[in-house]
Amino acid sequence: TMTVGTAATASQGSVDSLKVSNMFQPPSGTTNQRPPAKPGALFYNFDFKTIEFFDGNSWRQVDNTTTRGRALMFGGFDVPALFSDIDFVNIASQGNTQHFGDLSAGTRMGNSFANETRGIHGCLYPSNTANIDYVTIASGGNAIDWGADRTTSAQQQGALATSTRGIFAGGASTNVIDYIEISTTGNCTDFGDLTTARRNIDGFTSPTRGVISAGGEFPHSNHQTTDFITVASKGNATLIGDIIGEISGVRCFSSSVAGYFAGGYNPGVSLSRVKRMVTASLGNAIDFGDLSLARRSGAAGNNATRAVYMSGTTAFPAGQVNIIDAISISTSGNTTDFGDTSHNVGQTSGVSDSHGGLGGF
């Protein structure tokens, strides 16, 4: 038995376990004030409002997904309008979207990712700039310029994130992967390369691994293969193989163990199917269910139990819709009606603050 008081130290031996009778206070601070990353280190994060521990690869949050659950939809278009709107829903409760704020400009064919606190949107089209905007998800308001751009300007890029790092991948005529550290602004750095140039793609994460959907490259047909990366370490993507077929325009979401590919088109025909893939095994995606309407390039987000797929395009250029589907991610089956977006919109993108790439136990 060892009694621990204020400023007490142990000069030899080790403590295999510690029972605290009254109070135990770990180090605390913001994300930027985390202690040295040693396996087993504990920390209370003021940004995420939860206990974290370092598992040897990354900081993991403990049981904080239930305190969040907001999904955002960024921009998009409906002939002839180009939208700057940011709308949101609370995933746990059904209903229509509400206005959150606005991007720095009207845009379509961008993509976005989020951690527990920030949502980030990249690429403005048709201005075709590599601009990055961000918002604080818990509080509404207009987007703020990130302070750095993608290293390449490419619409229809893929996007995915863990709790600390966000990834933009590919896009029109490029295979470049960029990353940002989400807790700090003004950074965007080369990460590596996809196995081939991909556009009209999306991505999802587990707490360690990112998967980028097949996509295509104009004017050629869609790719059959999919890539994956280890988000915590820079480097080129690794080819998985043909796991979903030749599909562009899918929207992705994930639990902590599986990723989902929703909708898309091949070739030029919109699809309603939802497929599920176990992220750790990187095996073929299996049929999970169907959207209520075949479409592509909508906005997706999820919490631990439910995903939403908002709006999308049934046929280009004048086939945008305003429906929102709800998907139970624990059981296979078709979607149910969730509500409606404020207007018909396609070539949009979505994020949530409680997806499977953020950990949580």
Map each language-model feature to its residues:
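Polar, enzyme-active/binding microenvironments
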Residues: T1-F361
